[in-house]
Amino acid sequence: MDSCHKIDYGLYALEILAQYHNVSVNPEEIKHRFDTDGTGLGLTSWLLAAKSLELKVKQVKKTIDRLNFISLPALVWREDGRHFILTKVSKEANRYLIFDLEQRNPRVLEQSEFEALYQGHIILIASRSSVAGKLAKFDFTWFIPAIIKYRRIFIETLVVSVFLQLFALITPLFFQVVMDKVLVHRGFSTLNVITVALSVVVVFEIILSGLRTYIFAHSTSRIDVELGAKLFRHLLALPISYFESRRVGDTVARVRELDQIRNFLTGQALTSVLDLLFSFIFFAVMWYYSPKLTLVILFSLPCYAAWSVFISPILRRRLDDKFSRNADNQSFLVESVTAINTIKAMAVSPQMTNIWDKQLAGYVAAGFKVTVLATIGQQGIQLIQKTVMIINLWLGAHLVISGDLSIGQLIAFNMLAGQIVAPVIRLAQIWQDFQQVGISVTRLGDVLNSPTESYHGKLALPEINGDITFRNIRFRYKPDSPVILDNINLSIKQGEVIGIVGRSGSGKSTLTKLIQRFYIPENGQVLIDGHDLALADPNWLRRQVGVVLQDNVLLNRSIIDNISLANPGMSVEKVIYAAKLAGAHDFISELREGYNTIVGEQGAGLSGGQRQRIAIARALVNNPKILIFDEATSALDYESEHIIMRNMHKICKGRTVIIIAHRLSTVKNADRIIVMEKGKIVEQGKHKELLSEPESLYSYLYQLQSD
């Protein structure tokens, strides 16, 4: 118990959960406000503290078998103060992934272990932004506000549909009159009148039908544009972690699902629904003609529905399998094209072709299964339709023979029945499209329902100076992954040049990703000029931080467009000055088109060293106050590197510079060198100071490179 009083696990849990929801928290302030007696946060004070951070919290009692239905992560509250965070529940394996606040590590518990710790009290946590996100999630209900927005257009479509249905009602009546009156009484004058009237009806029906299609296509195209624009904006606003945890081809396949939704919106499905809504009027007229024949039609409708419901789940599973295989093909194709140099260099084209053939065969087989099942579904619909037609023919003929129905009435009845059955059959036949759209909406929802980087309510602060502070930083990429950064405390002064070295996987690049606010630390704060980056607008921050990576991507544009990417209106003089600092001006001037040279896709028209120098110029052109070189010179030839190092004084002047390097000669002139090992800072000092310690890690690495 004493250890519980020394460490307030409730406060620690609040800090972790707040960071998870991108909410900044100052533990000392929370402790001062809510832990008035110094014994730690009790349940009531913990709930008040969480609400003060604009978190939505709710204490509930749940039995263990209901835990897989709650939103995670959640805090499991214990009376002895040894709380823990529940992050995942696997009911199939009867295992529970928790974050142990005492050991500060994730743990997997078996059912019996969890039962021994769980006391039935759990606190559900959500940020207000996440609650709003759930209310605005993308599914079929997303289209309701869009329909309301364009309600005038849809009302016009509805009005046109009413007139079309009235014309559809009049036409059978004309045929009835012709059969029962004109033919019997040889009324040629009446026939002429009916023919003219029917011609007018047909002309108006064609015009209104075309008008309805135009209005409907126009409105759905607007919705399509809005959805497409929303999708791309949302995609670019997603955090780096989203893209790092998914294959490129999988993301592309999900985005392409927009085509399926587009085809559905502009197809016949929705107009068929409108036509079906007017069936009640036709039923009333048909009932007037013959209740018996009408009952046959009525009883056939549940048969259509039952058959579609029976086919649907099987069809959906097969469509899902088809999509998954298509996503695998997309991923493999993107990977193969991206790695074409490696594939050719290693002469592994036959192996890659073999893999592609197998995957393609699997996709084609999945598509064939979908086609077969869809065909079975359509033939089942046709069987019901033909059966109803035969029954109506037999029963209708009996009614005509017995004098209960005239020939004209039978023909009119069948025409009216066709107006009811036709949209039903169309809907049943396009049920496959609806199933596909349902999967498309779900897949697209994976993109649109993923939380974006939080911009709203974040602070856009004045121009930064360049002071950087890491305070008690602890970070891991996933709750169940190893710790990448552990207890990092580091202060970097404005204008200081810092070198960061260490073995691969020691956390060097991760440290700079926290500066760019690509991730929020699990524990601790990253401060720039004393401002917590968890509260800062990411765009405001990144505009003032220049980053050069080991492998930079150039866009398929001109060199000047690539350098001035963040500010297209920048003067040519500034672009040239940045290119000179980066040692790129000379080779650019030798190109035929100079700065207007198109670099090709991902800069394929340039050498690796040339691409790197353009990337350095791109990072310098906006005069950032913080400049990060993450193995930026490792791909340069010695001459290009010499030019960069010669200009390093000008490059570093007036800005804070962080240089990550494996080549220690790159950082030996830095104001301070940070040595990292297994996520911790183990040494720091100037080049000569670190070498003066022969047993230091820096000396060891330097000796290896000297040899």
Curated annotation (Swiss-Prot):
Residues 3-125 form the Peptidase C39 domain. ATP binds at G502, R503, S504, G505, S506, G507, K508, S509. It holds the Pfam family ABC_tran. Coiled coil: none annotated. GO terms for molecular function: ABC-type oligopeptide transporter activity; ATP binding; ATP hydrolysis activity; peptidase activity. Residues 154-436 form the ABC transmembrane type-1 domain. It is found in: Cell inner membrane. SMART domains: AAA. GO terms for biological process: protein secretion by the type I secretion system; proteolysis. Homodimer. Part of the ABC transporter complex HlyBD involved in hemolysin export. Transmembrane domains (TMD) form a pore in the inner membrane and the ATP-binding domain (NBD) is responsible for energy generation. This is Alpha-hemolysin translocation ATP-binding protein HlyB. It comes from Escherichia coli.
